Amino acid sequence: NYEILFLQGGASLQFSMVPLNLMSPKNKADYISTGSWSKKAIKEAKRVGTVNVAATTEEGEGENKFFKRIPKQGELKLDPDAAYVHFTSNNTIYGTQWMSEPEVGNVPLVCDASSDILHKPIDVSKYALIYAGAQKNIGPSGVVLVIIRKDMLERSLDSLHTMLNYKIQVENNSMYNTPNTF
């Protein structure tokens, strides 16, 4: 039911690839802001479509902004018509971590699991897409693991640039271009 990809660009490129591939056809998505990585993902997603920040736990003013907690389920202002809900499972910079996935109803759930992949069990069946930068728990920096539910591949538009298209990456076994060799 899932495809596994090893791609280039690390988790940071996924901040763009996720909305480019999954925002269609609704052109809007929910993001939960809990740290530096989710803020970067939000910034990139806004280049593609409408982003609803379903919750943020950012506190402070100016350069003294920080995150010290994960939002409670009741704080989430989710849009039932969103293309997906994105969250970062473990925010290492601020030391906050989700103990369980947010409840999102029937909206596909997307997770940046860079700090949690291979660290704890993850029930993949709860997700439409999981991505994880390799440098924390898997391998060399610049590589990213993407686990994508097969039905989500149909959202990738044919007009999307080849290297950014999950469907093309699956069709080419993650090797549309030459992968790193050592």
Residue ranges and their predicted role:
Residues 7-8, 32, 54-55, 86-89, ...:
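Short beta-strand segments
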Residues 134-182:
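Active-site C-terminal subdomain of aminotransferase-like
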Residues 110, 124-135, 144:
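Conserved active-site segment immediately N-terminal to the catalytic lysine
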